[in-house]
Amino acid sequence: MFVNRRYTARGKNLPSSPKKVRPIADNIRGKPYTEAVAILYSMPNKGAKLLGKVVKSAASNAMYHNRNLSEDMIFVKTVMVDDGRKRRSIWPRARGRADRLVNRSCHIFVEVYEKMYGGE
């Protein structure tokens, strides 16, 4: 019998722009957990490190709830990167003008599932 259970993790208000994290998320969607972590930690981007932490958290949640689960049975199913809070501040410019500076953050949602064959 084919068993499929899903486990999730969320990272909220992470200090990176969603525009920069989404292309990284596309690289790991649908891959095995070990391969996804290897891809993320070999990338030089800050967003890859943040995404790696959330993926590891989702896998840890899966292994906590199912003690018989190994890392080889975990696959990344869903990765969503949404807009987080925006911190706005003023950037002084020449001649008494000012520009608005927007520091963006993102919310990352990761869903992993276990793939195993067994009789339950």
Swiss-Prot record:
Keywords: Ribonucleoprotein, Ribosomal protein, RNA-binding, rRNA-binding. GO terms for molecular function: rRNA binding; structural constituent of ribosome. SUPFAM superfamilies: Ribosomal protein L22 (SSF54843). GO terms for biological process: translation. Residues 1-20 are annotated as: Disordered. Signal peptide: none annotated. The keyword Transmembrane does not apply. This is Large ribosomal subunit protein uL22. The gene is rplV.
